[in-house]
Each structure stands twice: as C-alpha cells, then as structure tokens.
C-alpha cells in the first residue's frame, strides 16, 4: 500500500431502487452510523466514503446513493461504470417498490460491469407490522432466479 493511496482496495457501491424506499437512510446509517426519520428526496446522486479494515487490509468504499425518480434515470446511468456492488433496495411495506425491482435489474444488466455483485435489500424492517412483501417473496422472485449474491432485510 503506498502512502498516497492509504488503502489496499477500493470498492464502488451503488444504491438503487424506487424513490422513498430508504436508500439515503441506508447510506447515512452505514457511512456515519446515524439515522434520520426525515425523508429528503435525493436529487441526482449523493456520495459518501467509508474506509474499513478487513483482515488487516484497508478497504475504501465509495457509496453512491442514486435518485429513484424516473426523471433522474439518465443522470444516474453513468454511475454504474466501475461499480463493484449494486444494492437493489425495496421497501417491505410497499409492494410497488418490490414489483419495480425487475426494471431496476434490467438497468443493472444494461449499465453495470458484467462482474458486479448484486445485493437485494428489503428495507424498513422496523415497520414489519405494515409488511406487504414477505422475505420468501424476495427469495423466490429475485434472489433464486436472478443470480443475486445476498438477500437481506
């Protein structure tokens, strides 16, 4: 590791999904270990950096939070370039956000590198009393059939 880079590995994460599924909250929780229940719509993209130590290696993660609105899709397409991991997020209390995952996966397949890792995230599990999408639905509908690496809630 050179003193200029200050990391051994660089990973680019891209968070995608419908507007309102909690992508920005995931980013804030991961990068800064904070939570905000105020919904602020992302315009274009947001970006955070977090450096981790994994088995004595410094891993720098660049995490890109994309806007979920249709009008920003042309802007966010360029952010797929060089992505190591794409996190597809849906809201477990919003069936429509789950049903739109197929469209998001098509975007990933068209725009991301062939070797990108895909992670499916069912968000807002703290609101499980309002659940519209079961864990098994995610597993059967997307995880088992679309070559995803991880499914988590």
Place the predicted regions along the sequence by residue.
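TRAFAC-class small GTPase G-domain
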Residues: 1-153
């Amino acid at each position: 590791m050179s003193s200029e880079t200050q990391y051994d590995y660089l990973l680019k994460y891209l968070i995608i999904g419908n507007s309102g599924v909690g992508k920005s909250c995931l980013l804030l929780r991961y990068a800064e270990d904070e939570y905000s229940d105020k919904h602020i719509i992302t315009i274009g993209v947001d970006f955070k950096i977090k450096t981790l130590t994994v088995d004595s290696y410094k891993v720098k993660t660049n995490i890109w939070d994309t806007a979920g609105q249709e009008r920003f899709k042309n802007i966010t397409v360029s952010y797929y370039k060089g992505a190591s991991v794409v996190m597809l997020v849906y809201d477990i209390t919003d069936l429509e956000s789950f049903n739109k995952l197929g469209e998001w996966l098509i975007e990933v397949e068209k725009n991301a590198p062939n070797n990108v890792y895909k992670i499916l995230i069912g968000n807002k599990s703290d609101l499980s009393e309002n659940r519209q999408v079961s864990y098994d639905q995610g597993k059967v509908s997307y995880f088992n059939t679309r070559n995803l690496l991880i499914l988590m809630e």
